[in-house]
């Protein structure tokens, strides 16, 4: 047998291995956690893979079919920790449990897969990241257009979008960053998705439009999808149906909290491709970290729901002027109250994900406790919001709600502190159910009964060593020292002899044991029943609870932006339909937070008179920072945030493009020059007059003449055809002559000065052209040997006098 062959026909396999292989054949592309007593074991290739990923010992389990069986395992009680690590690595796991009693007379225990865990279908908080959405996605191509569907089971969000080109789809994949991505077996554009960690090929039948339509209407309990803005034959139905079908295959048979599907119109938001997102370091830095990003500065939300929502906003800045102005208005109104509100919001749990687990009936006892705590503080929050006289704030207030009935139920039914699961009881509070109280009382009073029995018999028999004990093997027993065994009456039945003691039982004790154990199991069974009834009682309120969760997350974001505006000295931008961008004494929102010295502010004026600013100056002089801060301020303003400037007026922006070399990725076989040309080509084809374009040193990576010619021609095309708003930095001084040909091109520069072989950067933008590049001075700061620097200075003098070699 090879390690990838799951056939059970070979009679040389042991019964256990046959059972394992049979189960494994049903989940060939997943790791199979196979329970054996107190451990989950993995065999063959699964064992090797898990051993490598988790750095656990790889051992072996004898031979089967004349082959050594590789084996690795983890204890059952720590399995969740290892499962979480594997899921975060992009692995999918089938968990197979023993379902027969351990003491069954059958030699081979019955086992079955009880849950399937994939990166995109998890809802357990142990596997989820607090401030990140957890999307599973599916893609479909038809007539050179793409349909894309996303679903976050942990939140209950389901959306679809339509894309007319590869760049648009790639941008959406990067924005949503799915943890699992499904694609049809005949998908041709694998380069678009092959970089994702967990991609799953699915049969074409999963994307069948008729089957998908039926699945979706059944899911939403509707006769059609017209109410969601989706026509019967629209091709977005295909990937959406594939997601529903796949999730059902993953042992999630019903999704009661998925009640609608949202058609996401990407044209409602500012378009940013993956290159722009990387170079602007909005959510992740170029190195893939979360620190030193726009999100790391702006996202000081106090709830995980708010953290996720703000990151969504940062990834999809709006073009809707009324929406943006409404957010600015609420941020302004909330400024005097942010401390009070944040103090209360810190007590709010992740109600979004709790609601989803309640709908799926996978909520743990702590979810009920956290929901109770959250609902308990809502009245205090509402009292503060009522002080603010605003229609927008009042709408948030109405959505938050009160939920007195649910709160009363949870206070009455759930203990103040609860165990991690309902398995052993201890969750339902006293005085909630009379029968449960009686059963618990019987169990509780058993200790008093046993103590009385022990005192009575000890006195009657005059045996000092007489005592009553309990273990899981023999149950309740009477124990005496061997030296007192002659005093034991004949009615006592000896059940165990140990080194120094003997153990006995009596019918009275056994009968009482049965009553106590029966009461214990009856209590646990009843408690589980009452626990499940809570799901039924809460279910009708779930939609309102989800709306409340969203309102709380939105409030958290807006209050957070209020706090940021005060703490970081931001101003409310003026949003207008007019063309252009005016920023007075603007600052880079990220860089200013990490400088020891005050950030040097700069202004910018992009208008029909100043469409392109050509910026010269030394490396490290501030050119890239200046360009990035303009784009970041636009993004901040368009999500509803105040901005780092003394004054800001921002017109309509439809797209933001960047060509900044620090984001180059040559791992796919592209040279830096090819990357640059590809991105510039994309800009030339897709930018409009309302687009903001940042280009840092166009024309690198080839000869000076080739580079200058390309930079000149591209700049000319952008001015005459695209007519966009452009910030272009360059070391080609010749490029500044474009100002002589176009009245709406202006030259600016960042200056520096040298003194005693040292260079000082002024970081202040001025009108005009930089006289020097200061390249050698900057190079000396990098630690290049002084002898090389001095030689370079001599060569520069020769070059400038045309006496080259």
From Swiss-Prot:
Pfam families: MutS_I, MutS_II, MutS_III, MutS_IV, MutS_V. This is DNA mismatch repair protein MutS. InterPro entries: DNA_mismatch_repair_MutS, DNA_mismatch_repair_MutS-lik_N, DNA_mismatch_repair_MutS/MSH, DNA_mismatch_repair_MutS_C, DNA_mismatch_repair_MutS_clamp, DNA_mismatch_repair_MutS_core, DNA_mismatch_repair_MutS_N, DNA_mismatch_repair_MutS_sf. It comes from Buchnera aphidicola subsp. Schizaphis graminum (strain Sg). Keywords: ATP-binding, DNA damage, DNA repair, DNA-binding, Nucleotide-binding. One of its GO terms (biological process) is mismatch repair. ATP binds at residues 617-624. One of its GO terms (cellular component) is cytosol. This protein is involved in the repair of mismatches in DNA. It is possible that it carries out the mismatch recognition step. This protein has a weak ATPase activity. Belongs to the DNA mismatch repair MutS family. One of its GO terms (molecular function) is ATP-dependent DNA damage sensor activity. It comes from the Bacteria. The keyword DNA damage applies.
């Amino acid at each position: 047998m090879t390690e990838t062959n799951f056939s059970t026909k070979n009679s040389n396999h042991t019964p256990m291995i046959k059972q394992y292989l049979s189960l494994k054949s049903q989940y060939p592309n997943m790791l199979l956690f196979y329970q054996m007593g107190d451990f989950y074991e993995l065999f063959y290739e699964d064992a090797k893979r898990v051993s490598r990923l988790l750095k656990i010992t790889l051992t072996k389990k004898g031979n089967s079919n004349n082959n050594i069986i590789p084996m690795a395992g983890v204890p059952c009680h720590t399995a969740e920790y290892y499962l979480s690590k594997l899921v975060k690595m992009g692995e999918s796991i089938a968990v197979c449990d023993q379902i027969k009693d351990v003491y069954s007379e059958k030699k081979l225990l019955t086992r079955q897969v009880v849950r399937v865990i994939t990166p995109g279908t998890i809802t357990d908080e142990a596997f989820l990241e607090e401030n990140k959405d957890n999307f599973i996605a599916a893609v479909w191509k038809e007539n050179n257009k793409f349909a894309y569907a996303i679903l976050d089971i942990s939140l209950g969000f389901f959306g679809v979008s339509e894309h007319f080109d590869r760049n648009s789809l790639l941008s959406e994949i990067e924005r949503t960053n799915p943890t699992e991505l499904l694609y049809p077996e005949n998908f041709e554009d694998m380069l678009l998705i092959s970089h994702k960690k967990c991609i799953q090929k699915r049969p074409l039948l999963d994307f069948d439009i008729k089957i998908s339509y039926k699945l979706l209407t059944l899911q939403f309990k509707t006769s059609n999808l017209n109410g969601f803005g989706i026509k019967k034959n629209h091709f977005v139905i295909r990937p959406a149906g594939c997601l529903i079908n796949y999730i059902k295959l993953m042992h999630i048979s019903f999704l009661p909290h998925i009640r609608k599907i949202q058609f996401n119109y990407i044209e409602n938001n500012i378009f940013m491709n993956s290159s722009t997102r990387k170079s602007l370091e909005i959510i992740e830095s170029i190195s893939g970290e979360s620190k030193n990003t726009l999100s790391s500065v702006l996202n000081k939300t106090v709830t995980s729901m708010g953290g996720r929502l703000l990151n969504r906003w940062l990834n999809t800045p709006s073009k809707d002027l009324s929406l943006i102005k409404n957010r600015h208005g609420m941020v302004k109104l909330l400024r005097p109250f942010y401390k009070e509100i944040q103090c209360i919001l810190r007590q709010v749990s992740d109600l979004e994900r709790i609601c989803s687990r309640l709908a799926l009936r996978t909520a743990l006892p702590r979810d009920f406790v956290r929901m109770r705590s959250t609902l308990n503080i809502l009245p205090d929050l509402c009292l503060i919001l009522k002080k603010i006289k605003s229609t927008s704030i009042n709408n948030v207030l109405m959505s938050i709600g009160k939920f007195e009935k649910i709160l009363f139920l949870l206070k009455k039914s759930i203990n103040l502190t609860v165990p991690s699961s309902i398995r052993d009881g201890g969750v339902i509070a006293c005085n909630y159910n009379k029968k449960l109280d009686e059963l618990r009382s019987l169990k509780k009073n058993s200790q008093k009964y046993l103590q009385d029995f022990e005192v009575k018999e000890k006195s009657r028999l005059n045996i000092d060593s007489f005592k009553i004990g309990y273990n899981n093997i023999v149950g309740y027993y009477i124990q005496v020292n061997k030296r007192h065994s002659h005093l034991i009456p004949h009615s006592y039945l000896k059940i165990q002899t140990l080194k120094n003691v003997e153990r006995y039982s009596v019918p009275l004790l056994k009968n009482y044991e049965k009553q106590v154990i029966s009461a214990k199991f009856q209590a646990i069974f009843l408690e589980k029943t009452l626990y499940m009834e809570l799901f039924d009682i809460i279910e009708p309120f779930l939609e309102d609870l989800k709306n409340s969760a969203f309102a709380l997350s939105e409030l958290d974001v807006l209050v957070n932006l209020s706090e940021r505006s005060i703490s970081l000295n931001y101003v409310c931008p003026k949003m207008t339909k007019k063309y252009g961008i005016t920023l007075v004494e603007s600052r880079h929102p990220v860089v200013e937070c990490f400088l020891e010295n005050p950030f040097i502010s700069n202004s910018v004026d992009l208008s029909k008179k100043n469409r392109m600013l050509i910026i010269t100056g030394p490396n490290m002089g501030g050119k890239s920072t200046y360009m990035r801060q303009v784009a970041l301020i636009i993004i901040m303003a368009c999500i509803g945030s105040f901005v780092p400037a003394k004054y800001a007026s921002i017109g309509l922006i439809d797209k933001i493009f960047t060509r900044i070399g620090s984001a180059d990725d040559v791992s796919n076989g592209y040279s830096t020059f090819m990357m640059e040309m590809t991105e510039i080509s994309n800009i030339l084809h897709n930018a409009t007059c309302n687009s903001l374009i940042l280009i840092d040193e166009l024309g690198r990576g080839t000869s000076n003449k080739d580079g200058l010619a390309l930079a000149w021609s591209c700049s000319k095309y952008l001015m005459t055809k695209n007519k966009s708003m452009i910030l272009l930095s360059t070391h080609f001084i010749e490029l500044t002559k474009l100002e002589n040909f176009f009245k709406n091109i202006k030259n600016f520069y960042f200056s520096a000065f040298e003194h005693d072989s040292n260079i000082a950067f002024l970081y202040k933008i001025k009108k005009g052209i930089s006289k020097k590049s200061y390249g050698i001075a900057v190079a000396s700061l990098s630690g290049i040997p002084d002898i090389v620097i001095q030689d370079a200075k001599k060569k520069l003098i020769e070059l400038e006098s045309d006496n080259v070699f």
